[in-house]
Every structure is written in C-alpha cells, then in structure tokens.
C-alpha cells in the first residue's frame, strides 16, 4: 500500500510538472518556489533563454500575457492598449489583421521597448512591416502612436498588459474613460502592479516580489503638490518607471467613477497575487462614485511609529511610520519580552537587531511555507529595533506603575485591617521586590502618550478623506498670477466628483430651445419673400420651416459632431472632399451662399450633393427615409445658429455631421428686424470632437507676421508661394482694377460689380483685393477683429490698402493685437507681446510688412525654388491611416548639440545639413520611402512590354556578347577598386551569406533643396556590401561601355556635362527637330517587373545564370537595415546598388523609344530622357502600361525650351541651368570651411562658361524662357555666382546673405542683466536722423576728422561717405593698424560692441566682441578684432540664435554686396522696415551699410605696379539707398559703383613686378631657404626672418618638412612642396593659382607603405606651391651645383597630377547634376581624358621623380614651354617670374618606374593597337597635347631618362616596341603592355625586373590571363600564383 501511494504521489507530481507554467527564460529554483508561493500553488517550469534583469517582474508579465490571451480567443475584434508584438502576433493568427489594433505612444521609453522589433520583423511577414514602422514611431493600420485616448478604432473589448500606468499626462482613469468613448469599448481586462505602498505612500524594498518603490513630492504651490512614485526592480533604479502616485493609487481606491461621456466607470479587482492585480473595467449606467475601505490588518501589515521621528521631529528625511509585516513584528516583540522576563536583564539594541536579521528568511517545513520572507529595508531594521525596545520599556513602566498603585491600595487596606493575611503577604512582596522612582516613570509615560497612537492593529484607510483622495483636482485662485503655474499642472487631472457632468447636454438643450424662434423666423421670411415675388426662395424657406416643425429635442443629450477648424486658407473644405470621396451613401455639402455652392458643386459627383443651408434641411430630411447621406458637411458653420446643427441631426439621424469653420471669422448675423438673439454655434463648438489645422496655403508670410494674426493664430504656418503681398497706397496712387479685383468699402458699392462689404467675401478667394478705409461706417465695421480677419485673408497675390483717415487709424489697428476679452480668456502670463516695429515710409509706398531682401535669394524665392519653411515638414506616407494624426517632424530629430559648425545662407530654412549618424532620422527616411504600397504590374503584362522595349533597344544600341579580354579588364578594374576599399578576393566566398547580402541604409549628409509644399521625403543611400557588388560590377561596366559606343544614343553618364551639351547642340543645329524632355523619377508603381526583365535580358549575353538569378532576387525582395530598424523592400529601387544607373537608363530609354514615334536621337541618364526628332508624338497603345503611365506618372516637357539633367535645351543653344545651380548654391549647407572653399572653386569653374558674351546671352534667354522671368534676373544670378566663386575666405561676409562661423569672446554676465549693462546700453542708443539731417555716424565722422587734423598724417583715419547716408569704412594709411568700423557696431577696448542694429536683438543690450576665424593657413592678428554683425553661428537644432544674446531670429536678410549689379531694377522695389525684435518675422533689409571692406586706393606718388594684382579687378555695386544719395548730397560715386580689389597681406613689400619676402636661414639645413615671390609659409605668414615668427624657426621648419613630405635626410637640394590644387581639374594648368611652381599632390590620407626611405605622412594643407633651392649632398650623389626638385607620388592612385585626374569638374558627380566637390573627386572608373594631369616645375631646375621603391627618375631640365595661348610672358600673374613646364601624365594602377637607357622623348606613348600577336607599334617620338608641344630637339631632355609607367592590371602582351633612336631598332628587353584595353595609358617594363616579367612575359601572358579568369569563375583560390596583383 505504501509503495502504491508513493507511486501515485510520483505520478501526481509528474502530471503537475507537465501542466506547469512554461517560462521562456531560465529561472533558479528559489525564484520558482517564490512564484509558486505567490500564485498559490501554481507550478512553474524554467525555460532556455537567458534570464532578464528582473526575473520576478518578468514572471508577472508572462502570467498576465497568457491570461489575457484567453479573453481574446473567441472575440471578432481585438484592441490592445500598449501592445507587444508577441500578443499582436498571437491575435493575428486567429483573425484578419484588420481586426487587430494596438494603441501605444512614441516616447523615448516606448521607442526603447520597440527598438528590437525592426530587427526581428523579418521572421513574421504578416505584421513585419507594421512592426518595423512601430519601431520608428510611425502609425499604421495595426499600430497607432497617439495613445488610447486619441484613437478611433472601434472594438467592444480591449486588453492591457501592464500599460495603464499613469505618467502624469495620460492613462489616468478619465483618459481611459475617454478612450472607451472613442473606441466604443465596453470591457477592458487589465493586469497591473498595485503595491500596497500606494495607500500608505511609504518607501519599500520587497525582495519577495522583487520590486522597490520610492515616493517624491512635486509641485511648488499647495494646490499643486503631488507625489510621484518611482517603481523599479528590487534595488535597481537604473531603469525605473515614474508614475503619478495619486492616479496610480486611484485604481485601488475607486470602484466607480463618474465621467463626462454619458457613462460611469466600474473597476473590479478580480484577482490579486501580492501586488500583481487583475482589473475588469466596464461601463456603468448609474451615476455616483464608489470608494474602498482597506483594513490593513487583513493585508497583514502594521504601522509602527518611528521613535527617531518622535524624538527629532525636524528630521524631514525620517518617515513617520514603518509599515511592515505584522506577524514578523509580533514575533520579535514576543522574543524581546520573553528574554527580559527570563533573564531579568535589559536586552541591548544590538541583540534586537541581530534577532530581526534571523527572522528575515522564509521557513518551509515538509513543503509547507510556515513563514514568508520578511521584506524590510536595511535602514528600517534599526528603526524598528529602537521602536520595539522603547515599546517594551514603556510596557514595563506601565506594569510597574500598576503594581505601585496596587501596593498603595494594599497598604491602605492593611491599615484598615480589611485585607486577609495572604493579601498582606503580597503587599510585603511588592515592597521588597520593587524600588520604583515614581517621577521617572511618570515622565517616560507622559512622553510616550503625547505622541500619536503608535500601535495600529487595524488601521483603516478611508478613501473619501482628502488625505487619501488627492485625485480630485483643487482649483486655485484664477486671477492670481502665480496660480497659473499650478493650474497648468492640473489641466489634465480627474474632474471633481461633485462637478456637473451634463455640460454638453445643457449646451444642446440651450441650442434646442431656439428651435421655435428659428422656425418662426423662417415662416415670416418665407411670407416676406413670397410677397416680394421671389417664389423660389419662399418655397425653400417654407420647406425648411416644415423640417423645423417636426424636430423635437426630448431625450436629446449629446450629439456626436466633428468640428474642423483652422486659419483661413488651411484647406478644411479641400481636405473634406478626398476624405469622404469613397463613401457609398454620398455626402451632403451645406454652403452659406449660392456662390460658394456653385464653387463646391464643380468637384462633387453623384450621389453627393451641394445645397445652401435652408435647402439642405429639406434635402437631408427627404433622403433620410430612402438613402440617407453618410456624411453631412456644414461649411462655414460659424455663420449658422447652434440650433441649425441640431435640426440637421434630427433631419438625418444616421448621418455623420462634420462642421467646418473658424471661430475667429465672422459668425452668425441676424439681418432681420426681429432681433431673435439665437444662440451662436460657439456654445456647442466646445462639445464637439475637434480637429485643428495650423497650415495655411493662401495667406502670405507677411499676413502671418501681423500682430493681429499672430494673436489669433499663434501656431499658424504659411506655405503660400507668395512671400509679400501687402502694399500701402497714398491718395495719389491707384491700382488698375481687373476682373480679379474686389473693392471692400461702403462708398464704393455703387461703383463695383458685384458690391461687397468686408464680411461678404468670406469663404471666397481672389487674386487682388483693393481695400479702402475712409468713411465712418467703414471704420466702425473694420474695427471689429473678425471683420478685419476676413478682409486681410481673402487675397492670394496682393492686398492694396489705402488709409484715407485723417490720423491714419487703420495701420495702427493692424499693428496692435486685439483685446483678449473679445474672443477668449487666458491667464495673464500667457499673453503674447507684439514685436515692436518701426515704420519708415519712403515716397508714400512703404508699409509695415512689405520688407524683404533684394538679391539672388529673393529672385530664387520669387521663382519658387527656395521657400521659407520655418523648419517644419509634414511627414506622411500612404501607410498612415486617415483616422490618425499626422506625424510632424521639425527637420532635426536628434536634440544633441552640433559637433561642427554650419555655414549657410540665413534667409533659407528649407534645407538642412543632416547628420549621417542620426539613426532616428535615417529610419524615418527609410520607412517613408519604402513603406508604400506598390501596385506592380504582373509578370505576364511585363513580358509583353519587355519584348517591345528590347526590340527597340536592339535597333539603337549595338549590344554584343562581351569578349573575354573585355571581361578580364572590367573584372580586374573592379577588383582593384574593391582592394582600395579594404576588401579582397576572399570576400567573394561570402557572396551568398547573410553578411554578404546585407544592405545598410544611411542618411545623406546634404539634403537637396525641396519644395516644402510637396511634402517630399528625405534622401538616403542604400549601401550594398562590396563583396556583393563585385559580382555584377564587370557586367554593368560592359553594358555602360556598349551604350557609350552608339552614335544615335547618348549615354550622358560616361561623359561630362559640357561634352553632352556640345553633342546635343550640334545634333539640334544639323536640322530643325522637335525635342522633349521626360522624367520618370516618380513613375515607380508599375515598371518594376519591366525594368528587372530588361536588365536581365541584357545581362543574358555572357553573364552567368546564377548572377542573373541573384540580380532578380535582390531586385524583387531584400531587407534594408538601419541601426535601429529594418524594412523589407519589394521591387523598389536602391540608389546604392551597382546596377542602378545602368538599369534605370536601359528602362527609361527603352520605354521612351517604345512609346514615342519619330525619334532621331536620344540622350539618357538614369531617370531623365531627352528625345529629338521629326513629328514626335506619344503612342500609348504600343505598351500595356502606356495609358496608365501617360495619364499619371510621366512628366513630359513639350515647350520650346526644356531642361535635361543639369542644363537647358533650346533650338538655338544648349546652356547651363543657372537657376538650378543657384538653388543648389544658396540652398546648401556647409559643414566646415574646407568644404565651402572647395565648393567655391567648383562654382568658379562653372562660371567660366558665362564669360563668353554669346554664351551669357543664350544662357539668360534660355533660363528666362524656361522659368518665366526676365533676362536681368538671370544675369544677376550669374554675376552673384561668379562673385561667390571668387570670394576669399576672409571676405565671405560680402556674399549675399552668407553666415560665417564666429567665436564669441568671454564677457561679463553683467552685460545682460543688471544696472551696469542697462546703463552701458543706454549710452549707445542713438536716435535715427530725420531725412536731410546727419546721422550719428556722420557726426562721428565729423568729430573724427576734426580730431584727426590735430594728429599726424600717418595716424589719421579718413571716413568716406556712402550713398546710403552712412559712412564708409576708413581708408588705411601706411603703417597704421587696420581697424574695422561696421554698421551698428561701436568697438570698445573692453572687448564689447554696443549699439546693435540686428533684427532679433534688443537695442538695450550690449553685445560681446567677436573675432572672426580667418582663412586656414593665415595666422590671426591678435590686434585685429572684427566686430562684424553680419555673421552668426548656425546650428542644426538651434539655428536662429544670434551669438552673444538670448534672442532668436527667424530670418536675417543680410546685405548683398558681391553682385555686379543692383537687383532692385529687376525686381519690384522693396520697402525699408527695421525690425528690432522679431522672433518669427520675415526678412529685413540690412542693405543700408555695414559690410563693405575698405577700398584699396592707390596713394599719391605710387606707380600702378606698386599694387600688384593677384586677380582681375572687378566692378562691384554696393547697395545704398534707392536714390543713391547720402544725406541729400551726391557723392563722387553717384552711379553706385566703386572699384574694389582684393586685399593683400599687410606685411608684403611692394616692389616692381613681383612680391618678394626676405630670406631666413634655418639651423641645420645646410643652405638658405628662399621663399618665392607671393608665396606663404605653412603657417600662412610671409617668409620673413625668424624674429617675425614668434613660434620660432625650428617649428616652422618641422611643419615645412611635414607638409612637403620631406624626411630629415631630405632637407637639401631644391624641394617642391606639394600643392592641392583642385581648381585645375586637368583643364588648364595656368590656373594653378599664385606660386612659382605647383605640384598637385595626392590624397591627404597617404598610407604608410614599405620602401627604402622613410616618408613623413602628415596631411598636406592647401597652400601655394613653394620651391626651395639648396645646394647639398643627398643619397651619396652630388648635385653638380644646380637646384633640383624632388616629388613623392602616392602609389595607390598611380598618377602625377591633381586629385581629380580622370574626374574633371565638368563631369557629373554622384549627387545628381550638382557641382562636383573638388576635394572629394573619387570617381576613378571614368576613362582618363586627354591633356590632363600636368606636372609643373620652375625654369632651369632639373626635376627628378622618385617612387616608393626608391627608383629615381630623371626628367631633365624643363625649359622653353609653350601652351595653346603662346609663350607665357615673364610677368605672368599666376606664376610671376617663372615659366611653367608640363609633363604629360597618364593614370594607371601602379607607379613602378624604371630607367630607360635609350634616348626617349619625354612623355608617355599612346599604345591603343587592337591587333594581336607581335605586330610592332610605332616608335616613341613626341608627346603632343593641346597644353604644350615638345619637339625632338628639346635640348637637355635628350640626355636624360623619362619615367615610363608599369600598370598593375596587365592583361596581354601586344608585341615589341621600338625606341626613339635614329634606326628605330626594336629593343628586345622592352615589351609594350596595355591595361584596361588601352584606356588609361600604357607602359614598358624591363625583362630584368623579375617581379613583373615572370608572369607576364610575351607568349605566356595571354594563356595565363585567360586561364586565370576561367579558374576564378569557379573558385577564387584556383588561380594560384597567376592571380592578378
């Protein structure tokens, strides 16, 4: 029997183990036992995953998830609050995804929780994309990010797994009630942690349940004091949650709560395991709140008074009570009492503490828990011990006192002889045993009794009291200024239970009370109209009256109404049409007037209808019985009475009512004489569900800047294309009236058709509105805020205002904000202070807001290319459901500080420089571009179209199977590029691995200028792994080469823009042709299969099948990953794939050839196609996708002038797109000064095209025709770009609107606050002069000149008058330090500048001085302090801050001084308005003065040669006042032009024709170091003696050596310092800049390689090339007394010349058509053009070139050089005193040099023979280039050796080569070899060079090369030693 019972117990244990709760992570045995005890015997089983940080809290989460799945198992629709992907995935398994929804937030903690979803989404295709979007914080149909109380998904059941914790702003009980009302939810099952400490508000550390909780008090005022609960895992507050303690405790305290939504909330605690609680939240229909009474004894708790707090009441950190386990506490008390009684000795405090520690553990006997773990904080143990000890002492004292009183009674009884003998004995025993000090006992006892009752065996918490019910909001004094702070903190609190909950019902009842009055008014109006003969209107009113007669309001409480509101022109009506376009029942639009009805009726289709207000009542009531409308839209609802909306609801009860209106426009007006006083719509607007619009597309920016508009709409944003519109007219000026003009006036009614007043054009728009205000009735009408609002917001183009009142009452009323009492009540400290604006009128045409910058930026803004966007963009993709709020991004998601300064133009915020490491923004861009629905065509339809497309491509492009040699060359070239990027051949082995197919998505650092109204997404790069791209790179290169060989097909990607322009222009001039430009960039919905199959068809000729399969697989499906998320992409294109350009070009060109008929030739590049031919027309029926393409996505330019990539095409000429170039220039941000300088060089190179008169004329004509502007505007842009490209770094502030980095100096804080700063600022405040009076600077000029007359001439400073009424900057005299005097700035000796004249800065504040960082390489002069106010620092997230102040400026239109002509004649003259403090204003006009550098005047007695020219002088117009005058006097420069030349360093001595510096002798150099004329040292300073260099001579020498790449042992004969000269780009060597000899150096990041001599690898800085002539022995050779130049060349690039060898500036860059960044030219795949890569050397200096291996190559002396312009004169400006020598250099892949003993002419021969075998090539005779020609009798070169290159990518031996001798005999030791099929140059190598000749010798080369390629196609390792280097 015993065995059987044991067996049964074993089986029972096994069954229980099988039925145990399975965890997914590992848990210890102790943790499982605690969980089993907590959940009352429930078995748990450990998992296999790694445990989480807080295991016990994780167990609670798993239990809650499993329990909630039981509730959603059989319901049709599931809504989860705070969803997890696991729960949603489980819900989707049993129902459609559309029936599952989750509401969450997108704050930081939620992003952290959802972060891993982006990486795990790929294994669940059903919800993977939605989960990835959730990780990025983007809403979808499955997940929303606005919270439970802001969503409308309908579901009767909802679940919440630990997601209802309040954070102070959401998830309170009232928020949950609001969410239940919106979602239609009746039941919510929720699990929460509700610790009992929420009732006691005491800190606790519970080790048994694994949590810790702390409470902190917040709130400054008594009415706002709250407690926040900090909840975390046990003793781990690193990841704690912060909740509102009072709201959190409300789930425990309340069982029923009234809500204002027509129902109450009932809260039922269904289960409670420790603190883990399950709630059931349901709707209730009975009112009244229910609270809970908690006896703490039932919870097993006891409150023990803290004796430390009693003895030290001022100890604030001490708690008043210690809440602990009652059973454990009583056990300790029993032990202490027993110990005292047994021993008779007092127990010590240490013994009590020790015993408490022994009771902390749990006691388990026979599997039964007898005592639980005692959860008590460490700091509470001693407090508890003290309290227990004190309690026992008090109890003993009480006992002793009782015995003492008994003794006294015994004694008195003994005296009376009434006690028996035994009692007498007891009395004697008491007397013997106890000696009690009665006074001491009394004091102790009284001290304890004075305290509160300190033992609460059954403490009752009454939730009705104020102390335990702080969830009821306390309302503070409303009119007190400080109380508003508390009121804001309480704005989301739960309303009081005593507050009336029927406010909405009362509002509707009040509206319905007017029904009878409204109906009677309609009856009277109907009779009146019938008597007047207007039968139609009378019938309409009678029908509306009948509907009103049937309307009753019994039982009507709240009516569900939507209210859409926003500023004028925000698109409310426009948004309603697409929103309700697909409804089956149709929409009824209600309009206030017939005019608006007719306008709406044009775009409404059946079954929707448009009616006026009264007719709509009859129509809605009539159709409600048959086919009711789904939605009724009441436009301009503010113009209706409130009862009208209720009537419409009763007329069609099933229809959804949406009201559109604006509370700040004109409301309901009663035109009858009855004065019915109907309630306005505003009384029910507060009870409607409101949707707000804050973007206006109609109102221009200057209207938004008006104080009256700012007050009414403080958050409004304008996307209007019109920047300025308000014009103020005088009486003498009038405006020509057109049919688009309206007159708003009373006295003009008889003269206007139709007559209108200010309120009548509401809801209408016109182009021009002429607004007169002069009569008394007009002023009375327009002084009302709502009427003014309507009058100012009806126009779209211009608003002319003429104020004919005597005192000018209208303009001040516009500049004054309206009274707050007129429309709403707001606390005092919330009022907005208007910006102070000083109005300056000129010629009666100036107004308060008509001010903007006149210059290149303004022209681009007028053309719509640049837009002021206020830094806000709306991000919305198709995945965002219509029921959710849009996600608004401010353009800069990361809130951290900038890591580097930014340089940009201040007027524009439409573009930004983004951080490529910004993970959040990268993920937003990723999902925004790829998370869109793709309606791709089927493969069957695609195959039909592919046949047509490929047939046309065969006719135009000679595609042929690739030859093995071509494949070998392309593959070797690709391998070389991969090796340069750090990859090797072994990487191909991981070709099919997950790592090899990984695609990383990064954000582009420089975003393009985009139109903000089109809401385009950002730009990113999809970086494919290089080992994946290597597979198809060779075949892509072959396809591109074959496309480039076609005569009729122009592949623009393989050549520069200039070459493409020349070819297209020549083709068009052959004969008259039609031409069209097509862009298919946005055509990405149906062409996926077509483009894939077209590219696969081309690759099928020679490409292996597995590579084609790989391409199709990657094109159809792939995963793009960013750092914090990934997106699965299907079919859409990637910008980073190696095949993107070729694939797009093939598809676009083939598609156009198949669709168009009559094409003669075609040019294509990517998505852009240019077609030309006779009778061009589109035949869409030729392709199945043609009709859809032509109707929707194809952008065809059919005008006479079209744009194609970066230029403009017309029949006359093909020119550059100046507007496009200017947009990229002025809309670009620059991250550092170096990039800015390189970009300027690129712009200067582009501007060379504009120097030809014909090219300039045709460019102006083409651009003006294309963009619809004038030629003057285009000429102005060309001049501005030319000036931009030639401005020095030190003169950047002369560019239009440019902002440069500034460095604020230290300044005392008293400048900004305190009396000192105010007094100092008051001294600088100066009054503006009246017209004709001298201003403060003129007065200063006079005083300065008067004082200067008393000083010496050398210290005098002449102030030159300026045409704008101010003073020019001083003209410096020799020997006088330079001083800057700028506009509005007064420099002081203490480093501060006063008298600021900057917009956005308070004039009372002084500003610190600034020191501008000069150009790199120039040492800053410490005595030269620049206090220019024209420059400020730009950052990405706080880009509008003015340095040195706390103010921000939205825009700052700085002066335009670098242009060659005034922009005012080409644009309309602007109005001068000076804003002193404006945070969000428009542009100000800073053109008056302040930015002019001083003129370099030739002094008397100096020859012209004394001022050497470093560049051509330019005539620059300096903008002055419009009348070109100064103080009413005409200046000598009356034309507004002065001659400005470039500033020279002050330490250059002026000689005759050259700039010379003194020589300095360096220690240890062995000779003098001569600095050539006009050159600088590496520090940027002239080469003076050592005393001129404070850093010392040795430091300069070391830096000099580092920059020249010269070792310590190389300091000797003539060194040439390398110069980085991106300006040449292989175009013109003469433009190398200032310097005697410039050697273009290689990349600065030169890698360290092994060679014989040590190299110094310091980065070369940009500077002028210097030649150092020395006489010294080196490497054991004596230099025969002549100077020489040594050049080190980097082997990685294999070239001598500029960085851009093979990549000219005029070639296209990777950024579409953007000017190339000269310093970042990395495109080495383009074949080298002729005549590029020149080596310069001085006259008469032999040059020797040494490679990395130490081989010295003598090139001989370089003399007698000519170029295409003839012999250079000695006084050349660019190379003064020197000639230049050009060495033709071809690019190859390795720079190994050898000696050639035979006589060879200098240069590299062109070996392009395609013949095979041993056919000899011609002799090497001469190098013939356009830059220089060298004959056979070149003197000293004949006896020297020339460098001949050996390329590393040798493919095949062509045959022997002959030398340049007389007999032309072949040299058997020399072999001609070619690389890349002869594209990049050829070379020779010697047979004795064993490293090269072993593998590639004569007959072996061809066989080994072919064998190597075949082996490589099977396995990379099989090539063995024959693998290419």
From Swiss-Prot:
Origin superkingdom? Viruses
- Which keywords describe this protein according to UniProt? ATP-binding, Helicase, Hydrolase, Nucleotide-binding, Nucleotidyltransferase, RNA-directed RNA polymerase, Transferase
What range(s) does the Alphavirus-like MT domain occupy? 45-252
(+)RNA virus helicase C-terminal domain span: 694-834
Report any Pfam family annotated for this entry. Answer: Viral_helicase1
Q: Which residues cross the membrane?
A: none
Where the record annotates domain (+)RNA virus helicase ATP-binding, the positions are 533-693
Q: Kindly provide the name given to this protein in its UniProt entry.
A: Methyltransferase/helicase/RNA-directed RNA polymerase
Originating species:
Nudaurelia capensis beta virus (isolate Pine emperor moth/South Africa)
